[in-house]
Design a protein with these regions (language model features):
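Thiamine diphosphate
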Residues: 1-167
Length: 169
């Protein structure tokens, strides 16, 4: 919550995703104190959501693009891997959009969401992405500084959270 409140203080940030404005997943609880004017609720259309965030970033905003589960992010790999990650190269450095992405490895406690909702693709994405940093948030003590670093960076960052931590830590 502290990280999201800090990001919300920035004039150029907007939170976009599923259940960022209305309850429906654990990420919502980290955003419910954020002014509704800073949040854009979208339906389940991950590919379009990532494209929207890339466009917002190209226009000078810093979107915080929230995907409730890592497994759902697979739906936006074209926009992430072939567009956001390659934008700087494709434009010979003219465009360098900054998107802060949040996702979560689905929780297994108190209810196991099943294999299609609890996978960790961190290492796979680290090997595919060259202009987007991928950060696994392994300890709650590092979360705030990692979000600060993502905001202060001159590139996009994917921050991967553990869903179990929403209930445990």
């Amino acid at each position: 919550i502290k990280s999201m409140e800090w990001l919300a203080e920035k004039n150029d940030t907007t939170f976009i995703g599923q259940s960022v404005l209305h309850s429906g997943n654990a990420i919502y609880n980290t955003l419910k104190t954020i002014d509704e004017e800073k949040r854009i609720e979208v339906p389940v259309f991950e590919e379009i959501q990532m494209g929207m965030c890339t466009g917002m970033a190209l226009n000078g905003l810093v979107p915080i693009c929230c995907f409730p589960r890592f497994d759902f992010m697979l739906r936006c790999m074209d926009s992430l891997v072939n567009h956001l990650d390659k934008m700087q190269h494709m434009t010979e450095g003219t465009f360098k959009p900054k998107v802060i992405m949040r996702t979560s490895i689905g929780a297994k406690e108190p209810l196991d969401g099943g294999i299609q909702h609890t996978q960790d693709y961190t290492m796979s994405l680290k090997s595919m992405l060259h202009e987007v940093d991928v950060v696994l948030l392994e300890e709650p003590d590092n979360i705030f500084t990692e979000f600060q670093s993502a905001y202060n960076a001159d590139r996009s960052t994917l921050l991967v959270e553990y869903g179990d931590y929403y209930n445990e830590k």
